[in-house]
């Protein structure tokens, strides 16, 4: 019989840099997870994606065991990296802070495809373009 899920914890942690310090420690401690076990396993699994923020969904079972699924980095993080900026615009409709090409948008959409609710690459690209526009980026050909 399958184990019963008691709790689901969602976090965004820098790849390879999970530590028992806040915010990771308290969130896992409340769920009753072995914090050191999680941090070691997460860091080992994400070591190749250094510098990225990785969303993780942790399923906690009744016997306090856990497993977790790592997702692709958020579109905003990938767009900022592609454009070479630290943050988006405070006024996206007035102030444009950077531009990304359609080729960069396509590359990001291909990376994000497993986590996006999109039927094909074209609709995934439109989602990423919308995120870029809401951050104050222009999308150029």
Curated annotation (Swiss-Prot):
Question: For this UniProt entry, which segments traverse the membrane?
Answer: none
Report one GO cellular component: cytosolic large ribosomal subunit
Recorded GO terms, molecular function? large ribosomal subunit rRNA binding; structural constituent of ribosome
Top-rank taxon: Bacteria
Query: Is rRNA-binding found in the keyword set?
Result: yes
Q: Which key words are in the record? A: Methylation, Ribonucleoprotein, Ribosomal protein, RNA-binding, rRNA-binding
UniProt GO BP: translation
- PTM field: One or more lysine residues are methylated.
**Looking at the Swiss-Prot or TrEMBL record, what is one Pfam family this protein matches?**
Ribosomal_L11
Can the keyword Ribonucleoprotein be found in this entry's annotation?
Answer: yes
Role of this protein: Forms part of the ribosomal stalk which helps the ribosome interact with GTP-bound translation factors.
Subunit structure, briefly?
Part of the ribosomal stalk of the 50S ribosomal subunit. Interacts with L10 and the large rRNA to form the base of the stalk. L10 forms an elongated spine to which L12 dimers bind in a sequential fashion forming a multimeric L10(L12)X complex.
Family label: Belongs to the universal ribosomal protein uL11 family.
What protein name does the entry list? Answer: Large ribosomal subunit protein uL11
Species assigned in the record: Streptococcus mutans serotype c (strain ATCC 700610 / UA159)
């Amino acid at each position: 019989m399958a184990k019963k899920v008691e709790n689901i914890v969602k976090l965004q942690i820098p790849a390879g840099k999970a530590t028992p310090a806040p915010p990771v420690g308290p969130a896992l401690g409340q769920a009753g997870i072995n914090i050191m076990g999680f941090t070691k396993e997460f860091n080992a699994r994400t070591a190749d994606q250094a510098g990225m923020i990785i969303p993780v969904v942790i399923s906690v079972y009744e016997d306090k065991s856990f497993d977790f699924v790592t997702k692709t980095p958020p579109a905003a993080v990938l767009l900022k990296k592609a454009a070479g900026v630290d943050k988006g615009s405070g006024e996206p409709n007035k102030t444009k802070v950077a531009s990304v090409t359609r080729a960069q948008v396509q590359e990001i959409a291909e990376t994000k495809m497993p986590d996006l609710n999109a039927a094909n690459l074209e609709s995934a690209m439109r989602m990423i373009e919308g995120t870029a526009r809401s951050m104050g980026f222009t999308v150029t050909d």
